[in-house]
Amino acid sequence: MLSNGLKIDQEKKFFILIIIIINNNNNNNNNNNNNNNNNNNNNNNNNNNNNNNNKNNKNNNKNND
């Protein structure tokens, strides 16, 4: 009886460990996705800023001529 109880406890611990690992993987995936999204947003913002700066520079050059 005691050995059966110990076996069940070990199985519970094992499943809890698996759940923790899965949760950690999910959290890591979510963090990676968030980081990728942030990087994409930053890149888009930088591209937009560069495009705007280029347009402004062209306009300034035209006005100076």
UniProtKB/Swiss-Prot annotation:
Residues 24-65 are annotated as: Disordered. It comes from Dictyostelium discoideum. This is Putative uncharacterized protein DDB_G0275565.
